């Protein structure tokens, strides 16, 4: 890994956050944490296969600004579960800029969960807990079922599958906020039955546009209100969810 110039990184981070109205989330301490996160992620990338994005400019835009943009949709002091957290996005950036949030990051891959947990400890993020768990198991567990104000997910599965993996975690009155790709509108239209069946209502797709160094990123966020309890028959085993999505 090529050495990252700290001053250059801080300058780029500050510029991108300012251009996208995110400056209020930065402080000297938080910039230090984003720098430390970047160094650790790129150092550990070969071992854990964390990210295909290794250029600093793209990391700042695609990983940091993108995840921090989610913050505006999360109320103060909320509980958040990041389903399929992977390398810790959005959970790690959110934990850095929102110490008021109580975040649980879950993934079925133990080595990635270990990476997220160790990184959170290194950065002093006491508001983030990482757990190795399959979402369909956690959604049935009394410890986690309907215990969170928000569920987040980034690039995990198509919406019919994702809804069954995430909505069971969300309290009535909470929301699922899914960070999706270019097929978001189509996925949302095909997931109407799944959303209604699982207790979701009022689905909307919002396109978030962010400006970086010579690049513009448009990222759809799908937001679903949880209005009714999820029936006890859901989530089903993953083989059923994937073979026969709702």
Which ranges hold each PLM region?
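Conserved beta-strand signature within the Rossmann-like core of class I S-adenosyl-L-methionine
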Residues: 173-183
């Amino acid at each position: 890994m090529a050495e990252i110039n700290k001053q250059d990184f801080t300058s780029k981070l500050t510029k991108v956050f300012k251009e996208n109205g995110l400056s209020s989330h930065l402080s000297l301490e938080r910039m230090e944490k984003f720098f430390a996160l970047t160094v650790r992620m790129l150092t550990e990338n070969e071992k854990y296969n964390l990210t295909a994005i290794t250029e600093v400019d793209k990391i700042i835009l695609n990983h940091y600004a993108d995840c921090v943009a989610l913050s505006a949709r999360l109320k103060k002091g909320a509980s958040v579960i990041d389903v399929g957290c992977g390398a810790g996005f959005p959970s790690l950036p959110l934990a850095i800029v929102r110490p008021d949030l109580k975040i649980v990051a879950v993934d079925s891959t133990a080595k990635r969960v270990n990476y997220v947990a160790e990184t959170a400890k290194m950065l002093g993020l006491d508001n983030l807990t990482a757990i190795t768990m399959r979402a369909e198991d956690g959604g049935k567990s009394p410890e986690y079922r309907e215990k969170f104000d928000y569920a987040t997910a980034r690039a995990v599965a198509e919406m019919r599958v994702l809804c069954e993996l995430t909505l069971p975690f969300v309290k009535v009155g909470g929301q699922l906020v899914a960070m999706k790709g270019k097929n978001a509108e189509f996925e949302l239209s095909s997931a109407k039955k799944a959303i209604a069946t699982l207790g979701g209502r009022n689905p909307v797709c919002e396109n978030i546009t962010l400006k970086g160094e010579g690049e513009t990123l448009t990222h759809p966020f799908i937001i679903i209100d949880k209005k009714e309890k999820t029936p006890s028959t859901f989530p089903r085993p993953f083989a059923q969810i994937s073979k026969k999505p709702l």
